[in-house]
């Protein structure tokens, strides 16, 4: 059958727009076919929204929605509109929508020549929204709206009344708007204006016969939507008020549904209170309302744009949702260390949005999805952080944590280990041969602290074998996994290595170790606090990641090594190992005096020798400890130690610690709770000790070490910081980097405003400025420092012997704390952050502190002290107790010009400058508000700021101080410090700190007085017995010649002479024979009476012995021959009387008197300090004055006592290098050995070049031994090795009487002949030396010959006797009066002699022999070569 071809005219048609809408309705109103959708509908029975599957025709719902939106838009045009009535007559298939308010104008359109109501509702593409220049927030947009409802209705009636014009307009359309009846206009004099639309949908076009329940439910929900999204209206549905006043009420309809759904999901009749879902509502501004709830399924949203229900969301939903997701993600990452993907957060959100958008654009006429760009919204909606924090308190946070944990668990399981026989990924692993095999559970993995410990552990494997032992080194400390993220754990190499090597599987519940490569884990760390911390971190890792593993007895082990070894040399050689410091301290106090011994501190495993490690592994019973399986509340203690959530509990845990509590080293099995409470706690305490100062001196350990080092070095002349730091490190056994010490030194010397009120060190160089708070200090190698003169007035030297000094690394280091004369913690303030504790104490005025100290002395009421900063010119206001506010200084110097001349203390210049520059230039968030800014600083602050008149007015309104950030708070509510007993204490007031300091300081002033009086009493006793000894010698009651040493000592004991120890303390009585022999061997033996090994090694390295307690007779037997003269006898009597008078005067003083004396001296020095500081900051650097060389220790006079501290010192050859003896000097200061009374140095004699330099000598003279040089100082090698033989000693002593007789009989002759001899010597010298004028007065000084002989001698009686006997034997005449030196000594001296003259000023003390260029650095003023 053939068909006729269709013509082109028939194929292409043109239809009217009305026909197009009816033929293609989906373009305008959506589908006209029945569809099943998941929709929220209003359920009348439960009075809430419920989500259910419904069968509706979207097009029918859309034409209903268009009429509702028209009614809602009228609220924007007429804010006085208050009511919308919706009546749905399902049986009649009729719907009515009526709104009050301003109606449609009832007039004929000028251009179209028809009534405006007819044009709007009966003609397509007519609207009042076509002016795009006018920003509108209505729903109508394209000119279709109500016309679409008219087109798809069989009957459409418009009714509008305008009371203002007194008319009512009614018009009817039928048959899909194809029939338009003429309008009926009547008079309207009563009632409000209104607009009403009544229509009957053309159900046949929608494939429907009636309005069923599904479509009615959706329509009713849409009426509720209008009521919730349009503000300040009443909506009635079928004559019933909906009673929804705002968007929040509307959102709550969904809350009931969520609650009911959760009940159904949980199978409960009623949900627990904690499970009730919450909806968080927030009205951001007049155009944005947001509500949030947790979604139980996936992301859900209910949103409205200008009352239009955007069921498909759009840019406005993304705008809000993205903000919430981003901020929640940031919180999870920063605060909770959790990582969750954005879609996982979004899928758990239910968002409600009601907004007004200017000229909104949608994807289609159905308006289900907004497409307007965010920048075109016409308003912004920034979700506040407070709202996000509220969201984080809902179930969303819990779900995110669960999701994150699940993500982490999956990620961590990917890195699980397995039991395999060989692992090749870790080159440093020393794998056990049996690891990963069926015998793997018998193997032990040794985890060592670092590579150095690994080598030692490997050495130990030589003892136990490598079949069942493996080793692996840890790099530093492990990660605290308790709050760590999965990403942190996965990136931690140590944790991943342990899992692989051990074969551990994350979160696996272990009941035995047969599935592991190793069945035991042994920790081998240093025996210090850091080693304990590593053990704790491993325990924390195992407990939190592998449940059940620590329940297996014997799984976790530790290998302990000694922390100190004591080597006993006498009476018998022995070695004692100590595994903790308290045990060592106990032995030192109770047992050490019985032995001669030395100690060795084992800082780490690297200190041990390989042989020692093999010995340790050979005795595993002693060195291997087992951690007991978890019991009781062990898990709680692990959580307490490592959980960040337990910070407050940890603070109390630390506060309750009793000093001296340690883990019992004899325990074979260590309970984990004991380990945490008795060993691990020491690490946390050490952290606090490093960070929080002591209330007595205000120092942290590093600062205390620096001050100790400066005192020990007597740092009176400047020294590079880069040189001082290593010196402090060495002399205080500092175990950390020198760089941190250098920074501490810089901090103690900083003098800019806001730093130290009293800087204890002088800043000779760029030590930082106020610009950056000291961060701009120069490098340590460029700057110098020295002790401030005021420092020793604050830390009085007389207190040094009273402190308890710490013993570390075989040496005495800094004290536990210093006791300044006023509380430096208040003078300079303090701040720091430790474990569980932090502190902030501002500085105060030293003079106010002293005033209150005197109030305490007088039992008077204390005055209130306020924070004070040296050199600061701002003001401080007390706003409430313990709270202050600091203000800078700002003044108006012109109409719109301001001058800032001071900042709040510790607000640095750079901070304010950055703020002002931001105000000058602005950025994306801040507009420029400063017109101009100048800086005119010198040492003081000066900003000149120019504002515009508008900004000046605004600044006045805000406040000058507020706008320029010239206000800073100070709080006294966190004043934490260690109390005198070593416990952390929080102080409630400044006066409480002062009172705590006062009573301890007063007690120590009494101790100082007692100590000084005791030392004076000892000196009186020593002088008394020296007088008695000399008298007995002179009167022949005591003979010491030609007697064995032990016999002399025994006779002295029988005569009641006490021994005096190094400290100057007398010991009466006789120690037992064994101890006496040790004393004599160590302190009194000559070189040939001891075996070579003992004399070379034992006496040199022994640091403790019985002689410390019992002392020796060196104060008698070490006196010079000159001491046996009558003059010396009388002088000793006079010295004894002087000491008795000094003691009597001291006893008259009270502790408060001594303290007041110190305070007065400080006040004088402090005023000088303030003057110098003000001059320095003002640019006038005070003159330090010239330093005088040669001033310092005087020479010993002929008849002064022997100094026992020098006799047994090892002789030191001067090989062109400087000799440093500051350690020994400091020990003398500490012990206050006042054996030599200091006086001014003798007048120096300027001569021609002396014979010792330029005179030609015979070979015999050059080879002859010097009769006056000290063998302990100048000799390169020992001469007269047989000098100590008893026979030779006897021969020397035989000549004592003869020498005494000669000295007595020739004394007058010597006085007469000495000048002549000097003249002869001078004339003789003139034959070989260039003439130089010599002052007659100095040249003729009497007894110069004898003085010179003694000056060059530092020898004992025996050495002087040796000189005299040599002279007697050689029968030398005049030349014997000239001191002779060896060739090396003479050449050494000659090298440093100036060409024009030679001045000789010799010091008998061996620690005075220091070259000139060393003097300033060593704090010694002794000079040998100086021109007058």
Swiss-Prot record:
<feature type="modified residue" description="Phosphoserine; by CK2">
    <location>
        <position position="1272"/>
    </location>
</feature>
<dbReference type="GO" id="GO:0000722">
    <property type="term" value="P:telomere maintenance via recombination"/>
</dbReference>
<dbReference type="GO" id="GO:0097047">
    <property type="term" value="C:DNA replication termination region"/>
</dbReference>
<protein>
    <recommendedName>
        <fullName>DNA topoisomerase 2</fullName>
        <ecNumber>5.6.2.2</ecNumber>
    </recommendedName>
</protein>
<feature type="region of interest" description="Disordered">
    <location>
        <begin position="1083"/>
        <end position="1102"/>
    </location>
</feature>
<keyword id="KW-0597">Phosphoprotein</keyword>
<keyword id="KW-0460">Magnesium</keyword>
<feature type="modified residue" description="Phosphoserine; by CK2">
    <location>
        <position position="1266"/>
    </location>
</feature>
<feature type="site" description="Interaction with DNA">
    <location>
        <position position="651"/>
    </location>
</feature>
<dbReference type="GO" id="GO:0006271">
    <property type="term" value="P:DNA strand elongation involved in DNA replication"/>
</dbReference>
<dbReference type="InterPro" id="IPR013760">
    <property type="entry name" value="Topo_IIA-like_dom_sf"/>
</dbReference>
<feature type="region of interest" description="Disordered">
    <location>
        <begin position="1240"/>
        <end position="1288"/>
    </location>
</feature>
<keyword id="KW-0067">ATP-binding</keyword>
<dbReference type="InterPro" id="IPR006171">
    <property type="entry name" value="TOPRIM_dom"/>
</dbReference>
<feature type="region of interest" description="Disordered">
    <location>
        <begin position="1303"/>
        <end position="1428"/>
    </location>
</feature>
<dbReference type="GO" id="GO:0000712">
    <property type="term" value="P:resolution of meiotic recombination intermediates"/>
</dbReference>
<feature type="site" description="Transition state stabilizer">
    <location>
        <position position="781"/>
    </location>
</feature>
<feature type="modified residue" description="Phosphothreonine; by CK2">
    <location>
        <position position="1258"/>
    </location>
</feature>
<keyword id="KW-0547">Nucleotide-binding</keyword>
<dbReference type="InterPro" id="IPR001241">
    <property type="entry name" value="Topo_IIA"/>
</dbReference>
<dbReference type="GO" id="GO:0005739">
    <property type="term" value="C:mitochondrion"/>
</dbReference>
<feature type="site" description="Interaction with DNA">
    <location>
        <position position="480"/>
    </location>
</feature>
<feature type="binding site">
    <location>
        <position position="99"/>
    </location>
    <ligand>
        <name>ATP</name>
    </ligand>
</feature>
<feature type="modified residue" description="Phosphothreonine; by CK2">
    <location>
        <position position="1086"/>
    </location>
</feature>
<dbReference type="GO" id="GO:0042802">
    <property type="term" value="F:identical protein binding"/>
</dbReference>
<dbReference type="Pfam" id="PF01751">
    <property type="entry name" value="Toprim"/>
</dbReference>
<feature type="site" description="Interaction with DNA">
    <location>
        <position position="477"/>
    </location>
</feature>
<feature type="site" description="Important for DNA bending; intercalates between base pairs of target DNA">
    <location>
        <position position="833"/>
    </location>
</feature>
<feature type="modified residue" description="Phosphoserine; by CK2">
    <location>
        <position position="1269"/>
    </location>
</feature>
<dbReference type="GO" id="GO:0031055">
    <property type="term" value="P:chromatin remodeling at centromere"/>
</dbReference>
<dbReference type="GO" id="GO:0003677">
    <property type="term" value="F:DNA binding"/>
</dbReference>
<dbReference type="InterPro" id="IPR002205">
    <property type="entry name" value="Topo_IIA_dom_A"/>
</dbReference>
<dbReference type="GO" id="GO:0000019">
    <property type="term" value="P:regulation of mitotic recombination"/>
</dbReference>
<dbReference type="InterPro" id="IPR013506">
    <property type="entry name" value="Topo_IIA_bsu_dom2"/>
</dbReference>
<dbReference type="InterPro" id="IPR013758">
    <property type="entry name" value="Topo_IIA_A/C_ab"/>
</dbReference>
<feature type="modified residue" description="Phosphoserine; by CK2">
    <location>
        <position position="1408"/>
    </location>
</feature>
<dbReference type="Pfam" id="PF16898">
    <property type="entry name" value="TOPRIM_C"/>
</dbReference>
<dbReference type="InterPro" id="IPR013757">
    <property type="entry name" value="Topo_IIA_A_a_sf"/>
</dbReference>
<dbReference type="GO" id="GO:0006265">
    <property type="term" value="P:DNA topological change"/>
</dbReference>
<feature type="region of interest" description="Interaction with DNA">
    <location>
        <begin position="333"/>
        <end position="336"/>
    </location>
</feature>
<dbReference type="GO" id="GO:0009303">
    <property type="term" value="P:rRNA transcription"/>
</dbReference>
<dbReference type="Pfam" id="PF00204">
    <property type="entry name" value="DNA_gyraseB"/>
</dbReference>
């Amino acid at each position: 059958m053939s068909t006729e071809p269709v013509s082109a005219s028939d194929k292409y048609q043109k239809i009217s727009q009305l026909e197009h809408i009816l033929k293609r309705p989906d373009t305008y109103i959506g589908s006209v076919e029945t569809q099943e959708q998941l929709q929220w509908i209003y359920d009348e029975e439960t009075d809430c929204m419920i989500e259910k599957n419904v069968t509706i025709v979207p097009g029918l719902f859309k034409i209903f929605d268009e009429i509702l939106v028209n009614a809602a838009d009228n609220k924007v045009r007429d804010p006085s509109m208050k009511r919308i009535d919706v009546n749905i007559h399902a049986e009649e298939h009729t719907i009515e929508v009526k709104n009050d308010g301003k109606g449609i104008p009832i007039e004929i359109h000028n251009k179209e020549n028809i009534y405006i109501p007819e044009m709007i509702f009966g003609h397509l593409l007519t609207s009042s929204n076509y002016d795009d220049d006018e920003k509108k927030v209505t729903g109508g947009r394209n000119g279709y709206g109500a016309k679409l409802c008219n087109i798809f209705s069989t009957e459409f009636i418009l009714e509008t009344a305008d009371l203002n014009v007194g008319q009512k307009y009614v018009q009817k359309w039928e048959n899909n708007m194809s029939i338009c009846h003429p309008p009926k206009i009547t008079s309207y004099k009563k009632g409000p204006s209104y607009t009403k639309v009544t229509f009957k949908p053309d159900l046949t076009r929608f494939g429907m016969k009636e309005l069923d329940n599904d479509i009615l439910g959706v329509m009713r929900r849409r009426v509720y939507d209008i009521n919730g999204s349009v503000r300040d209206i009443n909506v009635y549905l079928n004559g019933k008020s909906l009673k929804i006043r705002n968007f929040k009420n509307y959102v709550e309809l969904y809350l009931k549904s969520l609650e009911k759904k959760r009940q159904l999901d949980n199978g409960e009749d009623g949900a627990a209170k904690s499970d009730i879902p919450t909806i968080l509502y927030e009205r951001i501004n007049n155009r944005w309302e947001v509500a949030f709830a947790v979604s139980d399924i996936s992301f859900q949203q209910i949103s409205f744009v200008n009352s239009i229900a955007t069921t498909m969301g759009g840019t406005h939903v993304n705008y809000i949702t993205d903000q919430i997701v981003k901020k929640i993600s940031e919180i999870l990452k920063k605060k909770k260390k959790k990582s969750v993907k954005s879609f996982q957060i979004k899928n758990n959100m239910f968002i409600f949005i009601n907004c007004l958008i200017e000229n909104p654009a949608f994807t289609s006429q159905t308006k289900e999805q907004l497409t307007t760009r965010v920048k075109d919204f016409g308003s912004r909606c920034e979700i506040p952080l407070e709202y996000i924090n509220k969201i984080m308190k809902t179930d969303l946070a819990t779900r995110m944590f669960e999701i994150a944990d699940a993500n982490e668990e999956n990620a961590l399981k990917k890195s699980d280990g397995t039991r395999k026989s060989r692992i090749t990924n870790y080159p440093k692993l020393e794998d056990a041969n049996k690891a990963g095999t069926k015998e793997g559970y018998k193997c032990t993995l040794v985890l060592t602290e670092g590579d150095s410990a690994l080598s030692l552990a490997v050495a130990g494997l030589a003892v136990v074998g490598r079949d069942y032992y493996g080793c692996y080194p840890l790099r530093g400390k492990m990660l605290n996994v308790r709050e760590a993220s999965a990403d942190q754990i996965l990136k931690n190499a140590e944790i991943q290595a342990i899992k692989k090597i051990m074969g551990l599987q994350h979160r696996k519940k272990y009941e035995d170790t047969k599935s592991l490569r190793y069945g035991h884990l042994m920790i081998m760390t240093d025996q210090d606090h850091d080693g304990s911390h590593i053990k704790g971190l491993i325990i924390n890792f195992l407990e939190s990641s592998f449940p059940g593993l620590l329940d297996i007895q014997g799984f976790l082990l530790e290998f302990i090594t000694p922390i100190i070894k004591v080597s006993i040399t006498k009476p018998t050689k022995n070695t004692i190992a100590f595994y903790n410091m308290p045990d060592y301290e106990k032995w030192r106090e109770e047992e050490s005096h019985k032995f001669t011994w030395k100690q060795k501190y084992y800082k780490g495993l690297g200190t041990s020798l390989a042989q020692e490690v093999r010995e340790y592994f050979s005795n595993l019973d002693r060195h291997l400890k087992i951690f007991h399986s978890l019991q009781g509340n062990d898990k709680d203690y692990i959580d307490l130690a490592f959980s960040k959530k337990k910070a407050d509990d940890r603070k109390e845990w630390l506060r309750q610690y009793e000093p001296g509590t340690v883990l019992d080293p004899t325990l074979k099995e260590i309970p984990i709770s004991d380990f945490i409470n008795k060993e691990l706690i020491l690490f946390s305490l050490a952290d606090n000790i490093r960070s929080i100062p002591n209330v007595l001196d205000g120092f942290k350990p590093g600062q205390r070490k620096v001050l100790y080092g400066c005192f020990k070095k007597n740092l009176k002349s400047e020294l590079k910081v880069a040189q001082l730091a290593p010196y402090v490190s060495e002399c205080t056994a500092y175990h950390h980097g020198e760089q941190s010490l250098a920074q501490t030194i810089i901090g103690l010397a900083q003098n800019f405003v806001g730093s130290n009120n009293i800087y204890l060190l002088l800043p000779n160089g760029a030590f930082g400025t106020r610009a950056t708070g000291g961060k701009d200090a120069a490098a340590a190698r460029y700057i110098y420092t020295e002790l401030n003169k005021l420092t020793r007035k604050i830390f009085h030297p007389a207190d040094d012997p009273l402190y308890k000094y710490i013993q570390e690394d075989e040496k005495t280091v800094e004290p536990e704390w210093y006791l300044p004369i006023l509380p430096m913690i208040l003078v300079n303030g303090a701040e720091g952050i430790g474990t569980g504790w932090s502190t902030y104490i501002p500085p105060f005025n030293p003079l106010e502190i002293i005033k209150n100290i005197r109030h305490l002395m007088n039992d008077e009421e204390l005055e209130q002290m306020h924070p004070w900063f040296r050199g600061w010119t701002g003001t401080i206001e007390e706003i409430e107790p313990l709270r202050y506010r600091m203000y800078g200084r700002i003044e108006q110097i012109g109409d719109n010009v301001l001058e800032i001349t001071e900042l709040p203390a510790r607000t640095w210049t750079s901070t304010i400058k950055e703020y002002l520059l931001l105000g000058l230039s602005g950025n994306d968030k801040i507009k420029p508000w400063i017109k101009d800014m100048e800086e005119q600083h010198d040492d003081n602050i000066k900003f000149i700021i120019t504002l515009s008149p508008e900004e000046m007015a605004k600044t006045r309104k805000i406040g000058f101080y507020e706008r320029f950030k010239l206000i800073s708070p100070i709080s006294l509510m966190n004043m934490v410090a260690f109390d005198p007993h070593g416990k952390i204490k929080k102080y409630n007031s400044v006066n409480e700190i002062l009172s705590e300091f006062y009573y301890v300081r007063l007690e120590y002033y009494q101790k100082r007085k007692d100590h000084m009086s005791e030392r004076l009493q000892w000196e009186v006793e020593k002088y008394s017995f020296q007088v008695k000894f000399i008298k007995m010698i002179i009167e022949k009651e005591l003979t010491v010649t030609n007697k064995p040493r032990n016999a002399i000592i025994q006779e002295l004991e029988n005569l009641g002479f006490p021994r005096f120890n190094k400290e100057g303390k007398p010991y009466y009585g006789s120690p037992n024979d064994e101890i006496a022999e040790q004393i004599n061997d160590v302190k009194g033996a000559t070189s040939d009476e001891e075996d070579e090994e003992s004399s070379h090694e034992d006496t040199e390295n022994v640091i403790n012995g019985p002689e410390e307690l019992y002392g020796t007779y060196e104060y008698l037997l070490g006196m010079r021959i000159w001491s046996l003269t009558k003059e010396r006898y009388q002088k000793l009597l006079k010295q004894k009387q002087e000491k008795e008078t000094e003691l009597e005067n001291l006893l008259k003083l009270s502790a408060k008197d001594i303290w007041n004396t110190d305070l007065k001296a400080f006040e004088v020095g402090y005023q000088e300090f303030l003057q110098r500081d003000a001059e320095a900051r003002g640019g006038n650097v005070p003159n330090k004055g010239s330093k005088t060389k040669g001033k310092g220790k005087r020479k010993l006079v002929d008849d002064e006592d022997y100094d026992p501290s020098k006799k047994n010192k090892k002789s030191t050859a001067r090989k062109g290098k400087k000799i440093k003896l500051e350690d020994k000097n400091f020990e003398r200061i500490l012990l206050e050995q006042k054996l030599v009374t200091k006086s001014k140095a003798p007048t120096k004699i300027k001569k021609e070049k002396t014979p010792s330099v330029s005179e030609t000598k015979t070979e015999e003279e050059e080879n002859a031994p010097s009769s006056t040089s000290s063998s302990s100082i100048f000799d390169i090698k020992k001469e007269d090795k047989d000098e100590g033989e008893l026979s030779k000693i006897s021969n020397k002593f035989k000549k004592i009487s003869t020498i005494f007789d000669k000295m007595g009989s020739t004394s007058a002759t010597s006085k007469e002949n000495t000048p002549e001899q000097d003249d002869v010597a001078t004339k003789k010298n003139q034959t070989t030396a260039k003439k130089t004028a010599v002052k007659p007065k100095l040249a003729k000084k009497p007894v110069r010959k004898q003085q010179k002989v003694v000056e060059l001698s530092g020898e004992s009686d025996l050495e002087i006797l040796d000189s005299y006997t040599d002279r007697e034997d050689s029968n030398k005449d005049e030349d014997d009066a000239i001191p002779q030196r060896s060739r090396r000594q003479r050449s050494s001296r000659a090298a440093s002699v100036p060409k024009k003259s030679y001045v000789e000023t010799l010091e008998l003390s061996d620690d005075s022999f220091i070259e000139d260029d060393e003097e300033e650095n060593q704090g010694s003023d002794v000079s040998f070569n100086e021109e007058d």
